[in-house]
Amino acid sequence: MKLEQLMEGVPFTLVQGSLDTEIADIIYDSRKAAPGLLFVCIVGTQRDSHAFAADCAAKGVSALVIQHDIDLSALPGVTVVKVESSRYAMALMSANLFGNPARQMTMIGVTGTKGKTTTTHMIKSVLEAAGRKVGMIGTNGIYYMGRHKDTANTTPESYELQKTFREFLDAGCDTALMEVSSQGLMMDRVAGVHYDVGVFTNLSPDHIGPGEHKTFEEYRSWKGQLFKRCDVGVVNIDDENTAALLESHTCKLVTYGRDEKADYRETGYELLRTHDFLGVAFHVTGKDVMDVKVNMPGEFSVYNALAALAVGKVLGLPDAAIHDGLGKCVVKGRVELVPISKKFTILLDYAHNEVSTESLLTTLRAYKPHRLVVVFGCGGNRSKLRRYGMGEICAKMADFSILTEDNNRFEKVEDIIADIREGMNKGNPDAKFVEIPDRLDALHYAVDHAQEGDLIAVIGKGHETYRDREGVKTPFLERELLEEYAQQIGLE
């Protein structure tokens, strides 16, 4: 593709060279530099890749995109264009490179602090029940037409995102559904993407710190950007941050929740439990009247299902598809039951901060188990506040806790557990817990010491398939490990 075609819609200045330059592909990793490629120089939080421009030129790249002035003497024969924001430019250039695939599909984006992944899966289930062919991108990875790929970020970098949209379209997808993180919005990963429907789940403090957002207000503001980029916004009317988040929205709004003004309103729900089922049934009124049963527990499942229901109605899907899609949806690693015993219930969940842990335990406590047991750790090289917070919440809300590892990365598990213990002691000095550093041993302990009617929540990893020790990732699939152990000891 000619550089001129690649730059369509991008404000730029040609510094040197020609717009007739032929470009085979776009890169933003200097290690991939090769003849025929265009290298985008990005100013990152840790490093500025403009420093690698000369090295890329020496490796034969055909063109460079820069955000600030650099020494051109080392770039003979290389076309150079200057833009105001290289991240923004890369997003639009990537869309052009792959033929603007997002314009040829129904686009749905979901944002919020909690519930993005579950809501996205519920929407996917509803769409597929209606016969739609869906490509989905989010925390759990990329799914389309029976295929699955892992992704490093909830919202992939713009080049990977546009490439994925192209793969969706080529595979026959008519709808692209994705989680849209505040980081993805702030870092222009979704720049140039317009959504038919944007969804807001809820908002609470998270992702605030070095390399993320400076303040909660900034975090909220970036979340709100989605509703300047969609035709219809499906939003949680009950969240206290909704009004501020939508302050400058440009889309039509459809609301859901319990407020009497909600377009789709839940007016009563019932908790459902057996040893291998935790769910909820609820009644919907407002613009439609419907009874819904969801194969996931608790109040937050009601909200997630309401969001998916509202999206289905906005898109004109049949009520039967909405009902069936919600009824059969199961999300890997999100309150995911592992039915290994009729004596107790054990589940996996991705809850990995204070807010999500409190929400989960509040939900599980409502099912009135004999004991609520939590198996958890906290990630290494991450904020200690999460450790104190999760420890405090579990001490207050669980009957028994098993403290163990999560992804230690480059920290000692004993140091991480010590921080969690500090939070436990603050939350409840009389809290009952045990410390088992190895997570596999912790899983075995939970099973071996389970009592009749217990509800055991193994939290923090959820859908993850590995554990990270000293930067080395090794396979660790909690569902399989629990099933194997149950079979090994002859559990019934």
Tell me the role of every PLM-derived stretch.
Residues 62-68, 233-237, 375-376, 399-406:
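Short internal beta-strands
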Residues 9, 70-76, 171, 196-346, ...:
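Acidic, Mg2+-coordinating active-site environments of NTP-dependent enzymes
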Residues 44-46, 182-183, 204-207, 239-240, ...:
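Short glycine-rich anion-binding loops that position phosphate/pyrophosphate groups of nucleotides
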Residues 53-58, 169, 191, 365:
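Non-catalytic positions within long, well-ordered alpha-helices that form the structural scaffold/packing
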Residues 1-14, 35-38, 51, 250, ...:
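ATP-dependent carboxylate-amine ligase
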Residues 10, 89-237, 241-252, 306, ...:
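Phosphate-binding loop of NTP-binding sites
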Residues 23, 35-36, 61, 77-78, ...:
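Short, well-ordered alpha-helix to beta-strand connector turns
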Residues 1-92, 269, 293, 297-299, ...:
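N-terminal leader/targeting and accessory segments in enzymes
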